[in-house]
Amino acid sequence: MGYFKVKNSILNGNVRISGAKNSALPILAATILSSEKLEIENVPDLLDVQTMIEILRKIGKKVIFENNKVTLNGTVENHVVPYDLVRKMRASFNVAGPLAVILGESKVSLPGGCAIGVRPVDYHIMGLKKLGFEVEIEHGEVYIKKGKKEKEVIINLPFPSVGATEHLMTTAALMEGTTVIENAAMEPEIVDLQNFLNSLGAKIQGAGSRKIVIEGVNSLNGGSYKVIPDRIEAGTYAIAIAATGGKGYIEEIIPEHLEILWEILKETGTNVIIEKNRVFVDGEGKKRGININIQPYPGFPTDLQPQILVYLSLADGVSMVVENVFKNRFHHIDELVRMGADIRVVDGTAIVNGVKKLSGTKVEGTDLRATAALIIAGLVAEGTTEVHNDFHVLRGYENIVEKIRHLNGEIEHIV
């Protein structure tokens, strides 16, 4: 396994944001529903995307991925998704429902992904059963068989799960009758998935609200679609520029997708100027502590919690960050403490006492966003930091070394 060697740097300049990983993956899973030619543009070249493409190839789709464009043709033929692919990421489970819709059955292993606490597929399975599927779990495998769906089905999610909302919305698109998802997740990536499916002839409305209504259609057409920008990547670079005391533009983004982050940065002493499709961040000022509640969208995203903790670790005063989405998402704190941060966790709340400096050392990333946060910590720390378990970041950040270097950051990828 490789690692990143990171040195103290002030980030300055402009960074162009890639397409959203968390849109591209469910959109690619949804291509199972169409046998026509599809072109998906602005797809980031990431390990997770490569894994999803390999899954689609294994089940029969013809896929070409070049220059951030995925071209797909053909129908699915194989209802079994291999364990060695599914174990690599959670989003792979989203092929289970669509595959069973087309072939009448599917067999998918329970998924892997980031180790950040309990992320059960229970909500997915509950919803699939509501849609009339028979679901059995044996020896880590999920067997799904298509049954008879009622004309009108209401699925009330116990928690606004992004993955379950996307999975059930996609699955219901080609199922007869009406499906209503209550307490749906509201993330922009769900709106993007709805727009993609509707561009092919689906009849879905309400994405972006707590209630999504799907009127089943018989088939989906082909077409072209462009994935939205990655708001989490945008937020990561905005926090990195601010934390290092630099200045720069986050470009080719949809600023309203990160309104809560811009507010937090402003309140803590970072200057933020919002333009049409880019945001200017000036982190030269002194930073102040703040309290943050991590919540589903439109609240502060859990996928930016590790990064904002690094930023707050050098802010004056005390900050409290309450994690309400993934209660165990604090594995990065031990590594930050080793670098000199003063952070402790009490009942799902990170209490941060700002310090004057962090010091470089060897650290290990435990998941995608935690590893990105440790790279930011390496940029603000004195000396050199080695961030190990590079594969985590390669799952979710396209060209991260090149982009940080373009901002005048000192980083090297040792393979």
UniProtKB/Swiss-Prot annotation:
Primary localization: cytoplasm
Catalysed reaction equations from the record: phosphoenolpyruvate + UDP-N-acetyl-alpha-D-glucosamine = UDP-N-acetyl-3-O-(1-carboxyvinyl)-alpha-D-glucosamine + phosphate
Gene Ontology biological process terms from the UniProt entry: cell division; cell wall organization; peptidoglycan biosynthetic process; regulation of cell shape; UDP-N-acetylgalactosamine biosynthetic process
Residues bound to phosphoenolpyruvate: 21-22
Gene3D superfamilies: Enolpyruvate transferase domain
One Gene Ontology cellular component annotation held by this UniProt entry: cytoplasm
Compartments reported by the entry: Cytoplasm
Top-level EC class as recorded in UniProt: transferase
Pathway: Cell wall biogenesis; peptidoglycan biosynthesis
Binding residues for UDP-N-acetyl-alpha-D-glucosamine: 90, 303, 325
Location of 2-(S-cysteinyl)pyruvic acid O-phosphothioketal modifications: 114
GO MF, one annotated term: UDP-N-acetylglucosamine 1-carboxyvinyltransferase activity
Known EC number: 2.5.1.7
Function: Cell wall formation. Adds enolpyruvyl to UDP-N-acetylglucosamine.
HAMAP family with a match to the protein in the record: MurA
Record family assignment: Belongs to the EPSP synthase family. MurA subfamily.
Name of the molecule in the record: UDP-N-acetylglucosamine 1-carboxyvinyltransferase
Gene source species: Thermosipho africanus (strain TCF52B)
Organismal lineage: Bacteria, Thermotogati, Thermotogota, Thermotogae, Thermotogales
Name of the gene encoding the protein in the UniProt record: murA
